[in-house]
């Protein structure tokens, strides 16, 4: 772990405030005056020339500089003239001094940039027509704006062998300009020291030295930060140009973080998914599953309603026939004979529609696949099941205790925040659970949940660390709550959090208790009053079961009576569809305007990027049509009316991009004392231990060939999925 060298590279950084990006400015209160092309600007001591220029709206060209990475200063494209200085300086690395007059467009600056650009293009293949970076390439843009109109280089160009670093990132290393952005991203953000440089001068190459897969859950981000076409997307190769695609701002549902994304589509098909800036959630990064699992949206899709015939086979039918059959069964059964299970990719609109439908047939047996303890405060207090500190709040914490979770694969962008704070703010991290590679050092306290009792009682050495902390966080993974002693684990963590608040120097508004969820629908379902887990259905098996996107395999045919009528509504023929008597095809997250609530309780919206395939429809519309045929018509016909209903049930569900602060931690702790469950000695083992467990976790990613290639590459090595380069 290269914590010390990286910190030396980032020397001069102040402690990162909440939600901000890396800056070289110090905490000094006295400002100094500098001039940019004669325009006065006040900046803090330590501000670089480039930052001072940006403060007045002057854009300086750059290739190696990136706001979230350490300064390398090796591309020299940002050269500017300082009045009375003998030579031009690199704007990204030079701190300003009082009274400087920075000349960004002087003849000297222009000639320096032209010279640098000429050197960069000397060995560049200039293969823009067949380069996937074409149209969004920094080298194209800056050579047009700052380069010369001709080259003096007449010798043969350098050629570099391409590297095979796995099934996601395609390399054409002849295009590489050695900006080292990918290397710095890998070591600083992803925490993986797989990439580096070998050789020097004309022989310098970027690669892995020994051919191997770039083993990171964030590897796709090096495609975005590469300023040229050296690193591009393998699945996207030669499929579309950026100006041909339609961009739709949306939300990711592959985990519970709720990363902001842009869905690029062409001719009704998702071509690629890119990150969208959101400082409080994902900054400008997304995980590989978010970025590359989109091909699963085209495979194993349910496109037409299906019913099981007399021979026990599922056959296609019309919407009228399918809905009539389901409505007839709904009219035959009432109350406890009817139950529903909601899966991990279901939106809030569908959840409230299904809840209203079952309530109208006198049933309240609405369950989620994911278990959450109901003993003690359970789900009655919102603070008991949220990441209360917020994702960006990690940057303010000084101690983090992780319990029964592997955030690197359960919530990669949350883990990246922890690593960022660990690098910049000297964050101390401890883990109770199976030892895993989190990309940062931590104190492993053991894997037994009984350690929680020792910490709560104050007998464990780590109790003193928590007591001395000013802003501690205790993060409990939702996977730990799936155990038989989940209620006892939750009660113990609640007790620790409350004791910290009472005995340490924690400020009044700082929240210690945090739950890290893994699936996108869980928080909204709990907000709407769904029962966590399917234990109620196992104890009292229904005669009609509605599976709304339930593909987790939490219940099987063997758990239900032989005459139980099962309806599956969803978008993939995965785990739930084969056991159903009727299948109603729904829309995936890229095909509907829908509300999702992330693990910190922040409501966000997806937008329609493409239309659902075949006869598939949005989930709430299917449920609304079903209610009308069944004679229990739901009182809404439009999306706005459904959201008005959401507001009636839980107002926070329509306060988009806003977090309603949760409270009542003391009351939750008092109620947790009523839990009489005992902690087990079994070790806390998160379900996603290694990167192989990360790629295929839901119906979309399980249908993705790209994710299957990743699993194969991790299992057998990158050579197993090597693809010859066309270029």
Swiss-Prot record:
<feature type="modified residue" description="N6-acetyllysine">
    <location>
        <position position="709"/>
    </location>
</feature>
<feature type="modified residue" description="N6-acetyllysine">
    <location>
        <position position="84"/>
    </location>
</feature>
<feature type="binding site">
    <location>
        <position position="64"/>
    </location>
    <ligand>
        <name>[2Fe-2S] cluster</name>
    </ligand>
</feature>
<dbReference type="GO" id="GO:0008137">
    <property type="term" value="F:NADH dehydrogenase (ubiquinone) activity"/>
</dbReference>
<keyword id="KW-0004">4Fe-4S</keyword>
<keyword id="KW-0520">NAD</keyword>
<dbReference type="GO" id="GO:0045333">
    <property type="term" value="P:cellular respiration"/>
</dbReference>
<dbReference type="Pfam" id="PF22117">
    <property type="entry name" value="Fer4_Nqo3"/>
</dbReference>
<keyword id="KW-0479">Metal-binding</keyword>
<dbReference type="InterPro" id="IPR036010">
    <property type="entry name" value="2Fe-2S_ferredoxin-like_sf"/>
</dbReference>
<feature type="domain" description="2Fe-2S ferredoxin-type">
    <location>
        <begin position="30"/>
        <end position="108"/>
    </location>
</feature>
<dbReference type="GO" id="GO:0005739">
    <property type="term" value="C:mitochondrion"/>
</dbReference>
<dbReference type="InterPro" id="IPR019574">
    <property type="entry name" value="NADH_UbQ_OxRdtase_Gsu_4Fe4S-bd"/>
</dbReference>
<feature type="binding site">
    <location>
        <position position="124"/>
    </location>
    <ligand>
        <name>[4Fe-4S] cluster 1</name>
    </ligand>
</feature>
<feature type="binding site">
    <location>
        <position position="182"/>
    </location>
    <ligand>
        <name>[4Fe-4S] cluster 2</name>
    </ligand>
</feature>
<feature type="binding site">
    <location>
        <position position="131"/>
    </location>
    <ligand>
        <name>[4Fe-4S] cluster 1</name>
    </ligand>
</feature>
<dbReference type="GO" id="GO:0006120">
    <property type="term" value="P:mitochondrial electron transport, NADH to ubiquinone"/>
</dbReference>
<comment type="similarity">
    <text>Belongs to the complex I 75 kDa subunit family.</text>
</comment>
<dbReference type="Pfam" id="PF00384">
    <property type="entry name" value="Molybdopterin"/>
</dbReference>
<feature type="modified residue" description="N6-acetyllysine">
    <location>
        <position position="467"/>
    </location>
</feature>
<feature type="domain" description="4Fe-4S Mo/W bis-MGD-type">
    <location>
        <begin position="245"/>
        <end position="301"/>
    </location>
</feature>
<protein>
    <recommendedName>
        <fullName>NADH-ubiquinone oxidoreductase 75 kDa subunit, mitochondrial</fullName>
        <ecNumber>7.1.1.2</ecNumber>
    </recommendedName>
</protein>
<keyword id="KW-0999">Mitochondrion inner membrane</keyword>
<feature type="binding site">
    <location>
        <position position="92"/>
    </location>
    <ligand>
        <name>[2Fe-2S] cluster</name>
    </ligand>
</feature>
<dbReference type="InterPro" id="IPR015405">
    <property type="entry name" value="NDUFS1-like_C"/>
</dbReference>
<comment type="function">
    <text>Core subunit of the mitochondrial membrane respiratory chain NADH dehydrogenase (Complex I) which catalyzes electron transfer from NADH through the respiratory chain, using ubiquinone as an electron acceptor. Essential for catalysing the entry and efficient transfer of electrons within complex I. Plays a key role in the assembly and stability of complex I and participates in the association of complex I with ubiquinol-cytochrome reductase complex (Complex III) to form supercomplexes.</text>
</comment>
<dbReference type="InterPro" id="IPR006963">
    <property type="entry name" value="Mopterin_OxRdtase_4Fe-4S_dom"/>
</dbReference>
<feature type="binding site">
    <location>
        <position position="75"/>
    </location>
    <ligand>
        <name>[2Fe-2S] cluster</name>
    </ligand>
</feature>
<keyword id="KW-0496">Mitochondrion</keyword>
<dbReference type="Pfam" id="PF22151">
    <property type="entry name" value="Fer4_NDSU1"/>
</dbReference>
<feature type="binding site">
    <location>
        <position position="137"/>
    </location>
    <ligand>
        <name>[4Fe-4S] cluster 1</name>
    </ligand>
</feature>
<dbReference type="InterPro" id="IPR010228">
    <property type="entry name" value="NADH_UbQ_OxRdtase_Gsu"/>
</dbReference>
<dbReference type="GO" id="GO:0005743">
    <property type="term" value="C:mitochondrial inner membrane"/>
</dbReference>
<dbReference type="InterPro" id="IPR050123">
    <property type="entry name" value="Prok_molybdopt-oxidoreductase"/>
</dbReference>
<dbReference type="InterPro" id="IPR006656">
    <property type="entry name" value="Mopterin_OxRdtase"/>
</dbReference>
<feature type="domain" description="4Fe-4S His(Cys)3-ligated-type">
    <location>
        <begin position="108"/>
        <end position="147"/>
    </location>
</feature>
<keyword id="KW-0560">Oxidoreductase</keyword>
<dbReference type="InterPro" id="IPR001041">
    <property type="entry name" value="2Fe-2S_ferredoxin-type"/>
</dbReference>
<dbReference type="Pfam" id="PF09326">
    <property type="entry name" value="NADH_dhqG_C"/>
</dbReference>
<dbReference type="GO" id="GO:0051539">
    <property type="term" value="F:4 iron, 4 sulfur cluster binding"/>
</dbReference>
<comment type="subunit">
    <text>Core subunit of respiratory chain NADH dehydrogenase (Complex I) which is composed of 45 different subunits. This is the largest subunit of complex I and it is a component of the iron-sulfur (IP) fragment of the enzyme. Complex I associates with ubiquinol-cytochrome reductase complex (Complex III) to form supercomplexes. Interacts with MDM2 and AKAP1.</text>
</comment>
<dbReference type="Pfam" id="PF10588">
    <property type="entry name" value="NADH-G_4Fe-4S_3"/>
</dbReference>
């Amino acid at each position: 772990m290269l914590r010390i060298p990286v910190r030396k590279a980032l020397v001069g950084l102040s402690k990162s405030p909440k939600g901000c990006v890396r800056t070289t400015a110090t905490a000094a209160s006295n400002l100094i005056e500098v001039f940019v092309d004669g325009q006065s600007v006040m900046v803090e001591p330590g501000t670089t020339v480039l930052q001072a220029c940006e403060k007045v709206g002057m854009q300086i060209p750059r290739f190696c500089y990136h706001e979230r990475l350490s300064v390398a200063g090796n591309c020299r494209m940002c050269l500017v003239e300082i009045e009375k200085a003998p030579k031009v300086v690199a704007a990204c690395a030079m701190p300003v001094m009082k009274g400087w007059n920075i000349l960004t467009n002087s003849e000297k600056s222009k000639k320096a940039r032209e010279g640098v650009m000429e050197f960069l293009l000397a060995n560049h293949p200039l293969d823009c027509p067949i380069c996937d970076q074409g149209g969004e390439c920094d080298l194209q843009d800056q050579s047009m704006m700052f380069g010369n109109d001709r080259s003096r280089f007449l010798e043969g160009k350098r050629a570099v062998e391409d590297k095979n670093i796995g099934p996601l990132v395609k390399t054409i290393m002849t295009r590489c300009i050695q900006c080292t952005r990918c290397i710095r991203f890998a070591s600083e953000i992803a925490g993986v020291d797989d990439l580096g440089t070998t050789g020097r001068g004309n022989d310098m190459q970027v690669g892995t030295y020994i051919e191997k897969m770039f083993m990171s859950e964030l590897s796709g981000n090096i495609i975005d930060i590469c300023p040229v076409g050296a690193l591009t997307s393998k699945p996207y190769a030669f499929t579309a140009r950026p100006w041909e695609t339609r961009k739709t701002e949306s939300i990711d549902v592959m985990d519970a973080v709720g990363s902001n994304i842009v869905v690029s589509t062409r001719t009704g098909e998702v071509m690629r998914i890119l990150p969208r800036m959101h400082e409080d959630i994902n900054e400008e990064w997304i995980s590989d599953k978010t970025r590359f699992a989109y091909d699963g949206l085209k495979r194993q899709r349910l496109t037409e309603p299906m019913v099981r015939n007399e021979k026990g086979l599922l056959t296609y039918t019309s919407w009228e026939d399918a809905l009539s059959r389901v409505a007839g069964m709904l009219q035959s059964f009432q109350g406890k004979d009817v139950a529903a299970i909601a899966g991990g990719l279901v939106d809030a609109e569908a959840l409230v529609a299904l809840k209203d439908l079952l309530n109208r047939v006198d049933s309240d047996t609405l369950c989620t696949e994911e278990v959450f303890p109901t003993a003690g405060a359970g789900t009655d207090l919102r603070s008991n099941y949220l990441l209360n500190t917020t994702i960006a709040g990690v940057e303010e914490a000084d101690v983090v205790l992780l319990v029964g979770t592997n955030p690197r694969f359960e919530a990669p962008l949350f883990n990246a925040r922890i690593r960022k704070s660990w690098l910049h703010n000297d964050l101390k991290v401890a883990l109770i659970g199976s030892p895993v590679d989190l990309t940062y050092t931590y104190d492993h306290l053991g894997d037994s949940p009984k350690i929680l009792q020792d910490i709560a009682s104050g007998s464990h050495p780590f109790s003193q660390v928590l007591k001395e902390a000013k802003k501690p966080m205790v993060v409990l993974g939702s996977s730990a709550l799936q155990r038989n002693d989940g209620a006892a684990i939750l009660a113990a963590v609640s007790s620790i959090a409350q004791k910290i608040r009472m005995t340490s120097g924690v400020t009044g508004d700082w929240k210690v208790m945090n739950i890290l969820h893994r699936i996108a629908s869980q928080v909204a379902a709990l907000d709407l009053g769904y029962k966590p887990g399917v234990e109620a259905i196992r104890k009292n098996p229904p005669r009609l079961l509605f599976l709304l996107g339930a593909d987790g395999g939490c219940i099987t045919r063997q758990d239900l009576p032989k005459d139980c009528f099962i309806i599956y509504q969803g978008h993939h023929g995965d785990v739930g569809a084969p056991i159903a008597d009727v299948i109603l095809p729904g829309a995936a997250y890229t095909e509907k305007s829908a509300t999702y609530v992330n693990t910190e309780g922040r409501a966000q919206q997806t937008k329609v990027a493409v239309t659902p395939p075949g006869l598939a429809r949005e989930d709430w519309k299917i449920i609304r049509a079903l209610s009308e045929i069944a004679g229990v018509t739901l009182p809404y016909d439009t999306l706005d009316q459904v959201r008005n209903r959401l507001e009636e049930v839980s107002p926070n569900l329509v306060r988009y991009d806003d977090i309603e602060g949760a409270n009542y931690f003391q009351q939750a702790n008092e109620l947790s004392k009523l839990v009489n469950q005992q902690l087990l000695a079994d070790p806390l083992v998160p379900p996603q231990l290694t990167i192989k467990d990360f790629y295929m976790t839901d119906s979309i990613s399980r249908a993705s060939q790209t994710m299957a290639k990743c699993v194969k590459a991790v299992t057998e090595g990158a050579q197993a999925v090597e693809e010859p380069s066309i270029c």
